[in-house]
């Protein structure tokens, strides 16, 4: 099973955010922990972290027929990026949208997000656990 992981703007600064709390969680460490948590499953992950809307849309469109699901950490895109929402709805990909709890929150929570829909389920929590929970949703179906 192929899962796309789309990571939105400023998520590359996760290490900076965690350092303020005297922790050491970087984006690379988050990705490695996700891979470790699901390694016994028959899942292949394809990651993209970007600040650029067009790259995110290209990633979704080009991989739409190869992936069973999308794990999406929208960060600031959660409030305003209707183009990505439209793309998710058009390609009808099952989507887990991830929101980090405080202190890892990037400013937008599920209540302020535009990412809701028939194929979209939201998960809120600490970075690793919420991402793993979002991926496990695809195993249930």
Please describe what each predicted stretch is:
Residues 1-4:
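Extreme N-terminal starter segment of soluble prokaryotic enzymes
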Residues 9-11, 75-78, 101-103:
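Short glycine-rich anion-binding loops that position phosphate/pyrophosphate groups of nucleotides
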Residues 13-29:
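Glycine- and acidic-residue-enriched helix-capping/strand-helix junction motifs
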Residues 44-54:
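Short beta->alpha junction loops
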Residues 47, 104-141:
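Short, glycine-/small-residue-rich phosphate/pyrophosphate-handling segment
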Residues 55-59, 80:
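Short acidic active-site motifs
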Residues 63-70:
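Short acidic/histidine-rich motifs immediately flanking catalytic phosphotransfer sites
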Residues 88-108:
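Short, acidic/small-residue loops that bind anionic groups at enzyme active sites
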């Amino acid at each position: 099973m192929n899962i796309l992981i789309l990571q939105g703007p400023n998520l590359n600064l996760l290490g900076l955010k965690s350092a303020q709390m005297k922790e050491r969680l970087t984006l690379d460490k988050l990705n490695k922990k996700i891979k470790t948590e699901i390694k016994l499953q028959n899942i292949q992950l394809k990651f993209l972290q970007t600040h650029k809307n067009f790259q995110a849309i290209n990633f979704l469109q080009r991989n739409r027929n190869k992936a069973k699901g999308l794990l999406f950490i929208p960060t600031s895109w959660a409030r305003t990026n209707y183009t990505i929402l439209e793309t998710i709805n058009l390609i009808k990909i099952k989507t887990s949208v991830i929101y980090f709890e405080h202190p890892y929150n990037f400013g937008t929570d599920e209540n302020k997000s535009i990412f809701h829909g028939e194929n979209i389920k939201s998960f809120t929590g600490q970075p690793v656990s919420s991402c793993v929970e979002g991926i496990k949703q695809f195993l249930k179906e």
